UniProtKB/Swiss-Prot annotation:
The lineage of its organism: Bacteria, Bacillati, Bacillota, Bacilli, Bacillales. The gene is ung1. It comes from Listeria innocua serovar 6a (strain ATCC BAA-680 / CLIP 11262). It is found in: Cytoplasm. The active site is at 61 (proton acceptor). Its EC number is 3.2.2.27. Its main location: cytoplasm. This is Uracil-DNA glycosylase 1.
Length: 221
């Protein structure tokens, strides 16, 4: 088991698949726009250190529009329009914990409290959803989740949609809580995402395990 994300990345950097993956991403950046930026690609690790993780929210692909993705799943930069899936997440947060929707989509405050907001693909070409999913990110994500499965404290995995549920199939440690549900996208949210109460369920589990609950309110300081 690693002790920091830096240690984890150093370990991966020696592996042939990762060397090939970084080469492919680098070549794609030379040919066009790739999101998020190189410095933000692993920002979920920077904002949520390994020893602070409490919750994992697993997304699929970074946003592929200019200025949106900054390395946290579902999150966008502060001055960018809130995407539809995140609007639905805010609606459920209001219904679940009576927290008013934020006027921005920047989720760094969650990350800083121990919410690891990670995607299964960590880069994407502009305007091409899923364009990097076959570059080797699945192996990288599997290795991240393997580390988290062996984590020494109980974690909550919030898995929205079949893609996330399937990606986290290796999370088998009984001390963790898996909250599986429908994706918050406008196409699916009304089929069971609304009313699923993932935020209160997460905090109840954390309290039961003597871990500080998450303050989900993005409006408070």
């Amino acid at each position: 088991m690693v002790k920091t994300w830096d240690e984890f990345l150093e370990q991966e950097a020696k592996q042939p698949y990762f060397i090939e993956l970084m080469k492919a991403v680098s070549e794609a950046r030379e040919e066009g726009n790739v999101y998020p930026s190189e410095e933000d690609m692993f920002s979920c690790f920077r904002l949520c250190p390994y020893d602070k993780v409490k919750v994992v929210i697993l997304g699929q692909d970074p946003y592929h529009g200019p200025g949106q993705a900054h390395g946290l799943s579902f999150s966008v930069q502060k001055d960018v329009r809130i995407p539809p899936s995140l609007r639905n997440i805010y609606k459920e947060l209001k219904s679940d914990l009576d927290i008013d929707p934020a006027n921005h989509g920047y989720l760094a405050k969650w990350a800083e409290q121990g919410v690891l907001l990670m995607n299964t693909s960590w880069s994407v070409e502009e305007g091409k959803a899923g364009s990097h999913k076959k570059l080797g990110w699945a192996t990288f994500t599997d290795h991240v989740l393997e580390e988290l499965n062996n984590y020494d404290k109980p974690l909550v995995f919030i898995l929205w949609g079949n893609h996330a549920i399937k990606a986290a199939s290796g999370i088998t440690n009984p001390k963790h809580l898996l909250i599986k549900g429908v994706h918050p996208s406008p196409l699916a949210a009304s089929r069971g995402f609304f009313g699923s109460k993932p935020f209160s369920k997460t905090n109840e589990f954390l309290k039961e395990n003597n871990r500080t609950p998450i303050d989900w309110d993005l409006n408070s300081k």
